[in-house]
Structures are given as structure tokens and as C-alpha cells.
Amino acid sequence: FRGVIITKKATRSLAGIAGIVAVATLISKVFGLVREQVIAAAYGVGPVVNAYAFAYVIPGFLLILLGGINGPFHSALVSVLAKRDKSESAPIVETITTLVSAILLAVTVFLIVFANIFIDVLAPGLDAATRSMAIQQLQIMAPMAVLAGLIGIGFGTLNAADQYWLPSLSPLFSSVAVIIGVGLLAWFVGDRIDEPQYVQLGGFVLAGGTLVGALWQWLAQVGAQVKAGLGKLIFRWDWRIPGVSEVLRVMIPATLSSGMLHINVYTDLFFASFIENAAASMRYASFIVLTPLGIMSNMILVPFMPIFSRLTEPENWVELKQRIRQGLLLTALTMLPFTAIFIALAFPVVRVIYQRGAFNLAASEQVVPVLMAYGFGMFFYLGRDVLVRVFYALGDGETPFKVSMVNIFLNGALDFLLYKPFGTPGLVLATVGVNILSMGIFTVILNRRLGGLPLGEWGLSLLGLTVITMLSGVGSWGASWGWEKVFGAGNIFLQLLQLGLASTVAVGLFLLGAMLLKLPELDLLISRVRQKFLKKS
């Protein structure tokens, strides 16, 4: 990746950017993990978290869809601004910000007024008390609609200007706000925090902390954006700027496409409302998976998006195909070890992360099978995103949108078929099935559009890594079982050692097996890790 130019004035390598993003995202994810541990210890899988899981669906959907790094706002702005000077970028950013803010302000009012209808549609199976709490929480978090759009614009604008540290780090402010809110409540009421008389207050604090966190995240970005000369907080309605229409051409279909994908989450939660504590279990399990997934997706998708955008002409397709392969193989090399760990070591992972306070053994047993299902789908989730970014780079947001439309109906059908026989894990497996189908469709279309892809070569490499993943999972399970038989797992110290040993076995076996395949992408990863450690030592 040496010598790859990310902007006109920057000379950072692709791997260098990935390193910056990875470190910043890791810090954010650590704070996110602490946030989830605080919530789990305070409320377990009870009504507060269950209501919050449903109330957060729409604000969270908007924050991920519009405000997320790698989201459509981010992708559209990077693809357009990366080709322009700062003097051209500011008016584009200000115009897009004005339009987005006006639309999302109306969305905020709509959410507040009709919160009860949204909750009833999302979760018809909720009991009266949980429903009431979810409605209140949604009304509190509704202004996150506007903040989500502003955060997404800030992500894309700063990345296009070769600023990666702050955008990747800023989500930690949201986590800190929730930690402070729940922590203060726990300090005031003590062990009674999960008692019935404090349930409503707990829901209010959780939702309020989330809103304050989103506001804090945006304020952290906007200063850097203004300082860099990338647009000020002013109203601008100049739609004649060429770059504005170019951004909208990518942003609108990309937003619709990503929105269709997140409708699958709505569908999952609709069925989850009929399964006791399913929403809370999915929340806790998904966060464990999203921690490494978020770090690796930012490492892979953030630096690759500008590269894809510069290789869209036919004369550059040979290199574009190489970059697509790199994206997919790096995805496999980073995701599959976690798949082995989350399937083979699901119970030790959940026990170490969550099992304390109100989160007891019964709660762990509910979350474990859900974590295994999420772990199985990690590669397909991120691999689909890699291929979608290729379409965005080609200026085609329509194809992902059409595929997402088909997937809505497929996901609903799979949810209906799987939720009764498999319970909560069945809902997760339905989404995994949708992602597998999406990857297949995108691969076939790109194969035709780019004049053929070396699918046989790619497939053999991925098949080899799959076999290695299975073997490393079996080895890590054996190590965990052996440790518990010999030393036990009666305290957190022994549990940490057990999980650390078994995880090391999984990663070690995976690396040994992957080395036999002689993949250049593995050499790249290893060289980057060595460089990082050598710099620190």
C-alpha cells in the first residue's frame, strides 16, 4: 500500500490511515464496552434495557445510517470532496448541511408527536409498563435525528480532508455521557437502581444520557470542521453548485439502500417483541460482536473508499479488482478469528464481560446462543459492506438499493420461519442469510460489470480460511474446557486467564493455518503489526 495517495495534499499510506482509524476506534469501543457493562450491571436484561432496545431503534437507526462512519452521508461526501480543493468544499458542505438539517428537524417533531404509534408498530408484543417507558425514551431521544445528519456530514467532510483521528474517536463522547448518567443514578440510589420504583427514572436517565452523548459527539466535530475551513454553521441554499447535485446523486440512493438494510432490524425486533427479553439479549450480544467489527470495518472501509473512487475508469479496473480482493481477504483475515472465538467461547466471553450485578447466570444463558449466531455472520456482514462501497465508488447507488428492497421481504420471511423453532438466535440467523445472498448478488453483478473477477482464486482462499477457522474454533474450545477441568473458573481472575488462553489458541491456530495459504494480505497485516510494536518498543 506504500505510495497510495489519499488526498491531493496528503501522502499517508492506506495502511497508515487504517492504523490511525483502528487506534481511535479501539479507544471508542473500549468506552462503549464499559458503557454496556455499566448498563448490564445496573439493569441486567430487565424492562429498562428491553424498553430502551426498542426506543433506540429509530434514533439509533438514524445515527448509524446518517451519522455513522462508512454510512451513506460519509460515503457520498468522501467520494465527491476527495476530488476537490477546500475552497470548493465549504459551500457544498454548508448547502448539504442546510438541506439535511431542515428535513431532519421535521423528522424530530414527527417522532415526538407519534412516538406511541412507532413503538406499537415496532413492538406490538410489549407489556403496558415496558411500552410506556419505551414511548417516553423515544420522545427524549428524537432530537438525535438532526444530530445524526450533522455528525454524518462531519465524518465525511473531515475524512475527505485527511482527518481521521477525531471522527473515529468522537463516538466515545456518547458512551461517556451514558456512563456518567447511569453512574450518578447508581450513586444516588445504590443497589435499589433496578427496583420497580426506580425503573421509570432509570429509563429516563438512559435515554437522556444517550441524547446528551450525541450532542457532545457533534460539538466535538464541528469545531475541527470550521477550523479546517470546511464549512461554517450558516444557512446556504445554493443548489446550483455542481458538487451539491453530485453528492445528492450518491447520497439519496445510498441512504435509501442503507435504510432498507436497517428495516431488517425493525423486522427482527417486531418478532423479538414476542420473545421474552429477546431485544435486550440481542443488544448485549450484538455489542460484543460490533466491538471488533466496528474497529475492523473502519480499518478496511474508511481507507478503501477513496481508493475505490479513484479506480473507476476502465483503464484502472485491473487495480480495482486487486483492491476488491484485498478488501475481502482482509475482511476474512480479521473477522474469521473472531467467528471462531465467539462460537467456541461464547459462554466464557459473556461471563467475563457482563456477568455481575443484575446480570446473572440466567441472563448469560440467554445471551450466549445469540452471540454465537452473530459471530457466525461477521464475515458476511462486513464483506457485503466492502462490495457495496465498490458500487458507491462507481456512482451506482441504485443496485444496492434494489438488492436491499428484495432483502426486506427475504428477511421477513426468514424471521417468520426461524423465530419459533430457534427463538432469538433464529432472528440473527435470518439476517445472516440475507447478507450471504447480498454478497452473492453483488459479486455476480461486479463480475459482469468489470469484465470478470478471479472468483475461483478468491473462492479457494476463502474456503481455506473457513476450514482453518473451524479447526481453530475446535482447538480453542478444547483449551477452554481443559483449563476449567484443571483449574476451574470460580473467580474473575481464573475466568480471564481461561478466556485469554483459549482466545490465544484460536488466533494462533488461525495464523499458523493462514500462513500455509501464503496470502499477501496476511503478510501486510503481520508487517503492520510488527511496525506498530517496533515503534512502541
Descriptions of predicted regions:
Residues F1-S537:
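Membrane-embedded alpha-helical bundles of multi-pass transporters/translocases
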